[in-house]
Amino acid sequence: MNQETKALFQTLTQLPGAPGNEHQVRAFMKQELAKYADDIVQDRLGSVFGVRRGAEDAPRIMVAGHMDEVGFMVTSITDNGLLRFQTLGGWWSQVLLAQRVEIQTDNGPVPGVISSIPPHLLTDAQRNRPMDIKNMMIDIGADDKEDAIKIGIRPGQQIVPVCPFTTMANEKKILSKAWDNRYGCGLSIELLKELHGKELPNTLYAGATVQEEVGLRGAQTASHMIKPDLFFALDASPANDMSGDKNEFGQLGKGFLLRILDRTTVMHRGMREFVLDMAETHDIPYQYFVSGGGTDAGKVHISNSGVPSAVIGICSRYIHTNATIIHIDDYAAAKEMLIKLVTACDKQTVDAIKENM
C-alpha cells in the first residue's frame, strides 16, 4: 500500500459517520469521486456514486462500500451529567466498558468514556455477569445536566469510537476504527482513480451507501436509483484467525474474501463462476467466506427484477469494536480483483452471467 493510499484510508477511517450521520464521510467521498468521475449522483437517503458513462446500451455496473460505521446515539442526559445512549449497529456488551468515544456536537467533538465500575466496588454476582448495554452510560466530565447542555450535548447526536490510525510493528497490518466499512469507500475511490482516462465497456457507478449497519437501507434506495445489471459489494468481514486455526474462515493476509453464503444472500452461480475464473486466470489470492451476517448485496440482489451480486471483501480482526486490524496484502488482492472484474463486464459477459443461474 503506497503512502497516498494509506493517507486516503487514514482520512476515511478517522471521519465520524454512524448510521444516519454519514455527512462528513459523504462530503469527502464526493470530493474524491469527482476527481475521476463524469458526474456524481446521490439518492435522497444520502448514498453517493461517481459515474463513468459508457454507451447508451452498455450494462450498468454498481460498486459500493458503505459509509456508516457502528456507533451510538445520545438518548438522554442524567441529572448528574452522564449520557444514556442507544447502539447503532451490532455491538457486544463486553467490548464497550471503559472505551473512549466522541460525541459529535454543533460545538465540535466532545470526548467521553463509557463508564465502568472498578473491581473494588463490584459484588461477586456483578463480577460474574456481563453488564447490559442499557445500564451503561457515557461520562464526558460534566458536573451535571445543565453543564452537559452547556457543553453542547443534545439527544439525537451521534457518538463514534476513538482509535487512532496506527501502522503496527508488522507494517503490513494497520489498526484503526471503522475499517468496516471505510475499506469499501476507499476502494470505490481507488477504482475510479485506476480507471480514469481508460475506456470502459460499461457504465460504472462506484461509491458508497448509507445505513448498512442498521438494515442495509441505503443499498435498497441506491439500487432503485441506479437499476444495475450487476453489483459488487465491498465490505470488511470478521477475521477468525486469532486462535491459529488455519481452517477457520477469514485469515489475515491470505487474499480477498469471496463470500459464497450469508444470512441475506446465496451467491449467484454465474457471478461465482465469473469471479473464480478471473481470480484463477490472473493468479489473485482469494479465500472462500461464509458468514452469519449480511452485506448490501442482501438488498441489491432482490431489487428491481433481480441483480446478480458478489461481495469482494477483506477480513478484519475485531470488527464492530473500537480497534480493528486489516492486512494490506488483502486490500491489494481485492483492488486487483475488482479492477479485473469491472473492466471485463461488457454486454456479452454480463448477459452470460445473467443466464448462468
From Swiss-Prot:
Active site (catalytic residues): 212
Molecular-function GO terms, alphabetical: metal ion binding; metalloaminopeptidase activity
Tree of life domain: Bacteria
Example GO biological process: proteolysis
Hydrolase among keywords: yes
Residues binding a divalent metal cation 2: 180, 213, 320
Note accompanying the cofactor annotation: Binds 2 divalent metal cations per subunit.
Record-linked SUPFAM superfamilies: Aminopeptidase/glucanase lid domain (SSF101821), Zn-dependent exopeptidases (SSF53187)
EC number: 3.4.11.-
Broad class of enzyme this protein falls into: hydrolase
Names of the cofactor(s): a divalent metal cation
InterPro entries attached to this UniProt entry: Peptidase_M42, Peptidase_M42_aminopept, Peptidase_M42_dom2
Keyword terms, alphabetized: Aminopeptidase, Hydrolase, Metal-binding, Metalloprotease, Protease
Pfam families: Peptidase_M42
Residues that bind a divalent metal cation 1: 66, 180, 235
Family under the similarity heading: Belongs to the peptidase M42 family.
Protein's name in the database: Putative aminopeptidase YtoP
